[in-house]
Curated annotation (Swiss-Prot):
Residues 71-218 form the MPN domain. A motif (JAMM motif) lies at residues 164-177. Component of a COP9 signalosome-like (CSN) complex, composed of at least RRI1/CSN5, CSN9, RRI2/CSN10, PCI8/CSN11, CSN12 and CSI1. Within this complex it probably interacts directly with CSN12. Also interacts with RPN5. Residues 319-341 have a biased composition (Polar residues). The keyword Zinc applies. The lineage of its organism: Eukaryota, Fungi, Dikarya, Ascomycota, Saccharomycotina. Keywords: Cytoplasm, Hydrolase, Metal-binding, Metalloprotease, Nucleus, Protease, Signalosome, Zinc. Pfam families: JAB (PF01398). It comes from Saccharomyces cerevisiae (strain ATCC 204508 / S288c). It comes from the Eukaryota. This is COP9 signalosome complex subunit 5.
C-alpha cells in the first residue's frame, strides 16, 4: 500500500475506514471535546470577561449581605478543574477558587490545586497545604509590591471558594463537606464550594459540575445546616473566542510510544504462540502416526498367529477324524457277523472291549480350543474397535482446540498489526499535513 501519492484527506479517510480503534476516553480527548452547559438566561448571553471586570470596577461597596444565587466561572477555570480532577483519577483532589463578587453573583476567574492527601472518598488539607496556599496567593495575585502579579484590569482577585472532586458518585456535599463549607462561610464569606465528577464527565463528555453554599435552617429546638445549589454559568474571554474562530481545526494526537511498543510486543507474542502451536501439532501428528503404525503391525501379527492357530486346529481335527475312521474299521473285524470263523461268545474281554472310545476323548479338546480362539478373536476385535473410536474422538477434540487457539491468535495478531499500522499512518498523516501547510 503506497501512501506517498495520497493526500491528507485520503489518509484521514483511510484511518477512519480501516484502522479505527475504539479506545477508552483519555485525558486529552476529555479536555478537547468537553461540552459546557450554555446559559439559559437571556441577560447572560453576552457575558464576557471584560464586561464582568468593567462592572466590578463600577460597583460601589454595599453593607447589605447579598443572597448569592449564581456562580459565574471562566472557561479557563473549568478546564483547570477538569484537568486536575481527571489527572487525579479515582482519588479526590482539592483546590482554591480565585475571583470576586458582583451583586448576587460569585465570579470565579482562576483557580489552582493544593498538595493534599486524598483517598477515593475523602480529601484532607494539612498544615503544609495552607502554607502553600498563602505563598502561592502572595506570589501570583499580590499587587501591593508591584511584582509580577496576574493583572485582571485592576480588579483584585481574592479567595472566593474551594473545589474538590467526587470520582464516580456525582456532585453533592457530604456531611464533612457541609461542615467545611459552613465553617468557611462563617469566617471568610463570600465562599462557594464547587464539586466536579471527572469519571461521569469523561463518560458523558459533558462537564458534570455543581456549585453549593450552606444555609442554616432554624427550628424550635435545634438548628441544622443544609445546603443549596447555585446556578453555574460559564463565560469566556474575547481573546479566546477570536482565537477559537481563527485557529486551525486540527486534533493533535498525543503520541504514545509505550502504546506502540505494547502493540509490537503483543504482535511478537502472537507470532511465537502460533509457531509453538504448529510445532506441538506436528509433534502430536508424528506420535499418532508412529502409534498407529505400531498398532497396525501388532494387529497383523495377531491375524497371522490366529491364522496359524486355525490351520493347526483344522489339521488336528482332520487327523483325529482319520484315526476315528480307522478305529471303526478295525472294530468291525471283531463284530458278531455270522460269516466270521471266530467264536465271540467265549472270548475274554481284552483291550479292544473298552467302553471308552478314543474319538470322543481326542475330539472334545480340539473343539473347545477352537471356540476359545474364536471368543478371544471377537474380544480383540471389540477392543480394537473401541480404541479406534476413542482415538477418533481424541483427534476431533484436539483439532477443535487447535482451531480455536489458532483463531484467537490470528485475531490478536490482526488487531496488533492494525494498531501498529494505524499509529504509523497517523504519524505520516501529521507530517504530510505540516509539509502541505507550511511549504511555500
Amino acid at each position: 500500500m503506497s501512501l506517498s501519492n495520497k493526500t491528507v484527506k485520503e489518509l484521514r479517510q483511510l484511518l477512519k475506514e480501516r484502522y479505527t480503534v475504539e479506545d477508552e476516553l483519555t485525558e486529552s480527548i476529555a479536555l478537547s471535546s468537553m461540552r459546557f452547559k450554555p446559559s439559559q438566561e437571556p441577560e447572560f448571553h453576552a457575558l464576557s470577561q471584560s464586561s464582568l471586570l468593567k462592572t466590578k470596577l463600577k460597583q460601589q461597596s454595599s453593607t447589605d449581605i447579598p443572597s448569592y444565587t449564581h456562580v459565574l466561572i471562566s472557561k479557563l477555570s473549568c478546564e483547570k478543574i477538569t484537568h486536575y480532577a481527571v489527572r487525579g483519577g479515582n482519588i479526590e483532589i482539592m483546590g482554591i477558587l480565585m475571583g470576586f463578587t458582583l451583586k448576587d453573583n460569585i465570579v470565579v476567574m482562576d483557580c489552582f490545586n493544593l498538595p493534599v492527601v486524598g483517598t477515593e472518598t475523602r480529601v484532607n488539607a494539612q498544615l503544609e497545604s495552607y502554607e502553600y496556599m498563602v505563598q502561592y496567593i502572595d506570589e501570583m495575585y499580590n499587587h501591593n509590591d508591584g511584582g509580577d502579579g496576574r493583572d485582571y484590569k485592576g480588579a483584585k482577585l481574592n479567595v472566593v471558594g474551594w473545589f474538590h472532586s467526587h470520582p464516580g458518585y456525582d456532585c453533592w456535599l457530604s456531611n464533612i463537606d457541609i461542615q467545611t463549607q459552613d465553617l468557611n462561610q462563617r469566617f471568610q464569606d463570600p465562599y462557594v464550594a464547587i464539586v466536579v465528577d471527572p469519571l461521569k464527565s469523561l463518560e458523558d463528555k459533558i462537564l458534570r459540575m455543581g456549585a453549593f453554599r450552606t444555609i442554616e435552617s432554624k427550628s424550635d429546638d435545634n438548628s441544622a445546616t443544609s445546603y443549596y445549589e447555585l446556578e453555574t454559568i460559564i463565560f469566556d474571554s474575547e481573546l479566546n473566542r477570536a482565537l477559537f474562530e481563527t485557529k486551525l481545526n486540527l486534533h493533535c494526537v498525543i503520541e504514545d510510544d509505550e502504546s506502540e511498543q505494547i502493540s509490537l510486543n503483543r504482535l511478537i507474542d502472537s507470532m511465537k504462540q502460533y509457531s509453538y502451536l504448529m510445532d506441538s501439532k506436528n509433534v502430536r501428528t508424528r506420535i499418532k502416526l508412529a502409534t498407529t503404525s505400531e498398532r497396525v503391525s501388532n494387529e497383523n501379527k495377531k491375524n497371522i498367529d490366529y491364522q496359524n492357530r486355525s490351520t493347526r486346529s483344522q489339521f488336528c481335527l482332520n487327523t483325529q477324524r482319520g484315526d476315528s475312521t480307522e478305529t471303526s474299521s478295525f472294530g468291525s473285524m471283531f463284530s458278531g457277523d455270522n460269516t466270521s470263523d471266530v467264536d465271540m461268545e467265549d472270548r475274554n474281554l481284552t483291550e479292544f472291549d473298552s467302553t471308552d472310545t478314543s474319538l470322543c476323548i481326542n475330539g472334545e479338546p480340539s473343539i473347545h480350543v477352537n471356540r476359545v480362539e474364536r471368543s478371544s478373536r471377537s474380544t480383540d476385535n471389540f477392543h480394537n474397535s473401541k480404541k479406534r473410536m476413542n482415538s477418533n474422538q481424541e483427534r476431533c477434540h484436539d483439532e477443535g482446540n487447535d482451531m480455536l487457539q489458532r483463531n484467537v491468535l490470528e485475531t490478536d495478531y490482526a488487531r496488533a498489526k492494525n494498531r501498529i499500522l494505524a499509529s504509523k499512518i497517523k504519524q505520516y498523516e501529521r507530517l504530510r499535513f505540516y509539509k502541505d501547510t507550511f511549504t511555500l
